[in-house]
């Protein structure tokens, strides 16, 4: 039986009449990479703060067998939380950053970080503010890769970086860090760049989980049809969740409709994660 890393039942967070996170029930198994995707203010960070024991919450929540609200000290022995690269202390030298992380995280392996940095051109005596974007990413990776955590939580980790450096970050995360004994949670709104590394996905809108699925199943559920002229009425009868016009033709997106039936309406194609996200957030169903 697969070990469960996070188990939430009715997890919610409100500020007066404002529901930052509506009652949510979900679980995250060991050895998965979960993408938590939503617009700014959707509730992603609120959920993470509850998981990390950084804020109070309503409902039930267990993270690696611990209650984050009462056992945060024990929990953080096995958890690493990294926000975007802009959070690296710019006034510190690279070597001082390693000193700092070594002092605050019990599972940080300085020797491993040095081994990683020695393969780069990042100078230990240079202040973070003087590093190029590429060097900043390398330092960020050195910190992430060198913390032996069972749960790695990344909140918009590549915010503000150019696409080349964003891709470099995620490639290294997948190739050099992740294995079946670790679980990774990534929040982002840059959907296309993490699609290839995810095993599971969760969409959040206005504090509510509107979709939760394994990636393999998700890409089977959603199909787009470029409707053959004259078949628009039949296409509407099947209940598309989203409609549009492409090259003068009606396009419809369907969820959980047999592909053979849809093929009778026109040309079909499977959707990427970004298209599924947009259809789910803006669609009719």
Task: Describe the function of each predicted region.
Residues 52:
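Helix-to-loop junction immediately C-terminal to a conserved catalytic motif
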Residues 6, 21-23, 76:
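Conserved structural motif at the start of ABC-family nucleotide-binding domains
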Residues 242-285:
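C-terminal coupling/interaction segments
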């Amino acid at each position: 039986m697969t070990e469960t890393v996070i188990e939430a039942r009715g997890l919610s967070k409100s500020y007066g009449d404002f529901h930052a996170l509506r009652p949510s029930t979900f679980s995250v198994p060991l050895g998965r990479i979960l993408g938590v995707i939503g617009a700014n203010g959707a509730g992603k960070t609120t959920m993470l703060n509850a998981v990390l024991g950084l804020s109070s919450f309503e409902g039930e929540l267990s993270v690696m067998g611990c209650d984050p609200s009462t056992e945060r000290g024990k929990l953080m022995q096995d958890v690493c939380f990294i926000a975007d690269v802009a959070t690296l202390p710019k006034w510190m030298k690279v070597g001082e950053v390693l000193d700092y992380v070594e002092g605050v995280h019990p599972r940080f392996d300085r020797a491993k970080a040095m081994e990683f940095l020695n393969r780069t051109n990042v100078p230990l005596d240079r202040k973070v503010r003087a590093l190029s974007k590429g060097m900043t990413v390398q330092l960020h990776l050195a910190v992430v890769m060198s913390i032996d955590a069972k749960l790695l939580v990344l909140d918009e980790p590549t915010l503000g970086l150019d696409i080349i450096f964003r891709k470099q970050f995620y490639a290294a995360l997948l190739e050099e860090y992740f294995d079946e004994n670790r679980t990774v949670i990534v929040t982002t709104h840059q959907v296309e760049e993490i699609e290839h590394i995810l095993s599971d996905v969760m969409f959040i809108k206005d504090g509510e989980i509107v979709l939760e699925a394994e990636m393999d199943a998700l890409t089977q559920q959603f199909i787009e049809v470029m409707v053959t002229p004259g078949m628009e009425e039949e296409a509407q009868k099947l209940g598309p969740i989203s409609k549009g016009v492409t090259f003068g033709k009606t396009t419809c997106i369907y969820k959980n409709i047999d592909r053979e039936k849809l093929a009778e309406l026109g040309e079909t194609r499977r959707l990427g994660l970004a298209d599924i996200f947009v259809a789910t957030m803006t669609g009719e169903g």
